[in-house]
């Protein structure tokens, strides 16, 4: 028997206990087989791939930032590829890009805004298209989109679209913008129950009944849709948080009484007079009423979360109802008959106050509003402005059209303030 010890770097079967070796061999072989199968699956088990970004760049696409369903920028996501087309992009270049995009392993966001693309047929093969922006294009026919069930966001702002029947099967759609189109019939939206944001500003829409069964709708914009008079269909949309009815023909918002989660309500330039319904909207943060017929704002007394209020060009004469709305940051009272602003003296969070062309003469109530950054007193009877000397946070003060005294002294006291006089 040799006295040489067995090599530790080249063990042979005699170095291992026989039972252990026999047990280990099947496990090792099995693990190797599993690993091989995984490698083969990754290599050949899927036809999806990453798009050729260099080729896409040569075709006229620029890499952009991915977005959320509401259009806001999303955090970086390796599973998303956002592409923005150069305005000079042609239809043939779009067609040439499709082979690089189809069957992608990433969701695609495509921005063709302000190009001359009219025919959408080449896009039919993009089964991972997540977002499509066609703003300012001559597109009018949407038939190519009817089977794009992965589409979550579609922007048709300033297109020639009038008929949206092709969208009726896109049940995954969460955000749809039809702003400034000739769309008038909304029947295609009846079953799009996943919609969160819908923009119908400056459209020909009149009948809102197709919207009454959209349970997840959070934002609805109807500003400038001048045919809208009846909003009864919105009464069941209890998920609504933001509603724009600016420049519509509505004269009553009684239908909104169940919408207790409302956070932003825009009612500018409407014939509306009665706003009692807002008493039941405790979460309201933004309320815009300029140019409406409102003359009584007592309904606002309990809106403790309100931070932006626009009452310009209304019929109000008293703001006593605002005295406990301490969350207010922006208040516009321009072109009203307001004379007394004592109700504002405890609104310590106020940052912007517009009193343009009001009847306010005494501004002593502003003395303690040290968070004020913008103050507009133009065309008012204000004369004594010494009270403003302590408002060192003021960035802008507008005094033209007044008989304000001691302006030079005020400028010396507020050297960082831009004073328009």
Language model segments and positions:
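Polybasic, lysine/arginine-rich low-complexity segments
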Residues: 14-17, 48-49, 345
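Ser/Thr/Pro/Gly-rich low-complexity linker/stalk segments immediately outside membranes or between
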Residues: 45-65
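N-terminal Sec-pathway targeting helices
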Residues: 19-35
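Juxtamembrane cytosolic interface motif at the C-terminal end of transmembrane helices
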Residues: 26-27, 39-48
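Juxtamembrane low-complexity tails/linkers enriched in Ser/Thr-Pro and polybasic
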Residues: 4-21
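Concave beta-strand-loop units of leucine-rich repeat
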Residues: 64-70, 78-96, 103-122, 128-144, ...
């Amino acid at each position: 028997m040799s006295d040489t010890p067995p090599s530790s770097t080249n063990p042979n079967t005699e170095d291992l206990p026989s039972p252990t070796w026999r047990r280990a061999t099947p496990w090792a072989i099995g693990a190797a087989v599993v690993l091989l199968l995984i490698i083969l699956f990754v290599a050949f088990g899927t036809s999806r791939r990453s798009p050729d970004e260099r080729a896409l760049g040569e075709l006229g696409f620029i890499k952009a930032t991915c977005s959320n369903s509401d259009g806001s920028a999303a955090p970086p996501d390796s599973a998303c590829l956002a592409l923005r087309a150069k305005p000079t992009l042609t239809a043939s270049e779009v067609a040439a890009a499709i082979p690089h995009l189809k069957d992608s392993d990433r969701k695609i966001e495509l921005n063709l805004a302000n190009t001359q693309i009219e025919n959408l047929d080449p896009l039919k093969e993009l089964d991972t298209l997540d977002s499509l922006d066609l703003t300012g294009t001559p597109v009018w026919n949407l038939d190519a989109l009817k089977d794009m069930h992965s589409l979550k966001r579609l922007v048709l702002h300033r297109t020639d679209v009038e008929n949206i029947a092709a969208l009726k099967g896109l049940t995954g759609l969460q955000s749809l913008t039809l702003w400034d189109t000739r769309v008038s019939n909304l029947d295609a939206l009846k079953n799009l129950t996943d919609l969160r944001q819908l923009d119908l500003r400056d459209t020909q829409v009149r009948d809102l009944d197709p919207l009454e069964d959209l349970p997840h709708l959070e934002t609805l914009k109807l500003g400038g849709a001048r045919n809208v008079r009846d909003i009864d269909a919105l009464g069941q949309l209890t998920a609504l948080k933001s509603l724009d009815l600016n420049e519509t023909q509505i004269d009553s918002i009684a239908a909104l009484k169940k919408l207790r989660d409302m956070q932003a309500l825009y009612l500018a330039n409407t014939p509306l007079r009665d706003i009692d319904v807002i008493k039941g909207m405790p979460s309201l943060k933004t309320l815009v009423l300029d140019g409406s017929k409102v003359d009584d704002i007592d309904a606002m007394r309990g809106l403790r979360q309100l931070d932006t209020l626009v009452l310009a060009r209304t019929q109000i004469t008293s703001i006593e109802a605002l005295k406990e709305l301490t969350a207010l940051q922006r208040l516009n009272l321009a072109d009203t008959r307001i004379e007394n602003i004592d109700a504002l003296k405890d609104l310590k969070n106020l940052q912007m106050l517009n009193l343009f062309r009001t009847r306010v003469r005494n501004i002593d109530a502003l003395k303690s509003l040290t968070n004020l950054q913008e103050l507009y007193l133009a065309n008012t009877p204000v004369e004594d402005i010494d009270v403003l000397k302590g408002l060192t946070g003021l960035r802008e003060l507008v005094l033209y059209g007044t008989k304000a005294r001691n302006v030079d002294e005020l400028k010396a006291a507020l050297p960082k303030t831009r004073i328009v006089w």
